[in-house]
């Protein structure tokens, strides 16, 4: 009788462990199948805020606070369609890509705007087909490509300097 009781208890314990292990495995498999990143959220340098593109505006939220976010752009502009954006290293300026025109696969040219304080102004206007613009580490310059040549735009002096002159379509890509 004791042997049968012991066998019954041992079988129940082993069975419970198997069911529990299956449940844990199912939970692990479920978690692994989830996305590994959260698209659209960009963490800010202070570690306390993040931004999201909502409609045609960039909105800043706090991780620890709920509620309405702070709009980062001065005011909506009719000809501005925000397709991408990047903050300067000090996060005082925002480089905005607007109106992407596809080239091939994931490549595109676009118009660029610079938001700083309460102003929003077009930049890189003399460029024929600007693309891949980004801030320099000090935030004073914007580097970009135009017709496969590299350029640097000075945000303070509003002047462009050509860096390369050997770019050619489908031949030399700088």
Task: Spell out what each predicted region is.
Residues 17-174:
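Beta-propeller folds
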Residues 1-6:
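Bacterial N-terminal signal peptides that target proteins for export
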């Amino acid at each position: 009788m004791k042997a049968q009781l012991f066998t019954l208890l041992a079988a129940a314990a082993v069975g419970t462990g198997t069911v529990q292990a299956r449940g844990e495995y199912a939970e692990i498999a479920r978690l692994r199948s989830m996305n590994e990143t959260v698209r659209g959220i960009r963490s800010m340098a202070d570690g306390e805020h993040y931004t999201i593109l909502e409609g045609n505006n960039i909105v800043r939220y706090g991780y620890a606070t709920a509620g309405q976010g702070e709009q980062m752009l001065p005011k909506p502009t009719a000809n501005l369609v925000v397709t991408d954006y990047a903050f300067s290293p000090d996060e005082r300026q925002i480089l905005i890509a607007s109106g992407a025109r596809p080239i091939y696969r994931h490549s595109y040219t676009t118009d660029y705007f610079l938001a700083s304080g309460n102003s929003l102004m077009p930049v890189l206007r003399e460029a024929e087909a600007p693309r891949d613009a980004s801030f320099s580490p000090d935030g004073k310059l914007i580097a970009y490509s135009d017709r496969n040549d590299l350029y640097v735009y000075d945000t303070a002096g509003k002047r462009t300097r050509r860096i390369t002159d050997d770019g050619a379509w489908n031949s030399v890509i700088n």
